[in-house]
Amino acid sequence: SACNETDNLVLKSPDGKIQLTVTENDNTISYAVNKENAAMILPSKLGFILEHEDSLNHFVIKGTERSSLDETWEQPWGESRYVRNHYNELKVLLQETDGKRKLNVIFRLFNDGIGYRYEFPQQESMDSLVIMSEETEFRMSGTHKAWWIPASDPYYECIATFSPINELDTVRTPLTMETAEGK
């Protein structure tokens, strides 16, 4: 393993106010997010359930890649003509403990939020896959307010529902949240 149980990977937003920590413990990868030293997302696990395959959830960290970007692009319409795309990125290279499959998780921290995505690199042990369920957890630190669209709604072009996160059911992404402190 490139990391042991006490190792943490840390990524900060460009202004340093948001911090992401990725931890490997007992072959489980989790992440947590703080903003201005206050917990926003408590340690939360990553993983998948695949069709006709063992669950993808027993990993070790094999490496990392870091990058940053600060660019401005022009959009044809919208509230702002020019949009700043400014972030720090951490790509975490994962491998199952049996060495069979690989998975990468790419985190991006912006000054006003975070994003993540999974990447299945090309590999001999997996020529195709069907994801039955994404098991990523979001253990929030409080009862935040959220704007969301029900997963059962077939359209994205609808009015978002506003409610406390403890009242959410299955939702579509993106999900927008705000703490009581306005963070």
Protein language model regions, located:
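N-terminal accessory beta-strand-rich subdomains and adjacent acidic, glycine-rich linkers
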Residues: 8-183
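Bacterial Sec-dependent signal peptides at the C-terminal "C-region" and cleavage site
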Residues: 1-8
